[in-house]
């Protein structure tokens, strides 16, 4: 997934939006390019688009270290008319699974390896060139290679440090097996 939402002036958030704000319901029915494919029951061009309520979960409020003077809060997505959770929203799907585990006497603990590629050109350059002829930042396998991955530290060190400062339990990062591939590990929590 990706973070979607709005940027509020702090005072407006405190005065008017700390309990709810709104978004178009197409946000849960778009592809990565923000196109709205047909076939979704909850929203479509044929039936029109409505609103969802975004209800801030203030327990998730945290400073965003990489943007000065910025905080972030995650929201639950509610139906505009019933004020009930939208069942296909990512947080609602996750909460149902956590509730199922709890009912079975199990406490969920997760960790993840976030694997991705770094390229020589910027995303904007790559997009303009049609995502063709991508050149990885490294020309070979850098799996566990401390010396060679030093050249990626201008990206990886701030990533580790900013996420950790935002409360994400970062464990480590390392090179991976494919050219230009990186791995960021998040500790069990």
Please report, for each region that a protein language model flagged, where it lies by residue:
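Active-site-proximal, well-structured secondary-structure segments within enzyme catalytic domains
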Residues: 172-185
């Amino acid at each position: 997934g990706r973070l979607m939402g709005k940027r509020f002036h702090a005072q407006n958030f405190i005065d008017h939006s700390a309990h709810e704000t709104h978004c178009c319901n197409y946000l849960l029915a778009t592809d990565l390019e923000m196109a709205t494919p047909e076939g979704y029951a909850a929203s479509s061009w044929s039936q029109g688009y409505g609103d969802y309520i975004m209800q801030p979960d203030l327990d998730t409020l945290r400073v965003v270290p990489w943007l000065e003077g910025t905080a972030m809060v995650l929201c639950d997505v509610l139906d505009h008319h019933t004020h009930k959770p939208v069942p296909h929203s990512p947080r609602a799907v996750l909460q149902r699974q956590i509730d199922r585990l709890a009912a079975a006497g199990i406490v969920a603990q997760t960790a993840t390896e976030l694997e991705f590629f770094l390229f020589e050109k910027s995303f904007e350059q790559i997009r303009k060139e049609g995502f063709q002829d991508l050149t990885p930042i490294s020309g070979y396998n850098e799996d566990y290679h401390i010396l060679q991955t030093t050249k990626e530290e201008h990206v990886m060190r701030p990533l580790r440090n900013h996420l950790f400062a935002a409360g994400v339990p970062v464990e480590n990062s390392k090179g991976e097996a494919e050219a230009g591939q990186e791995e960021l590990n998040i500790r069990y929590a």
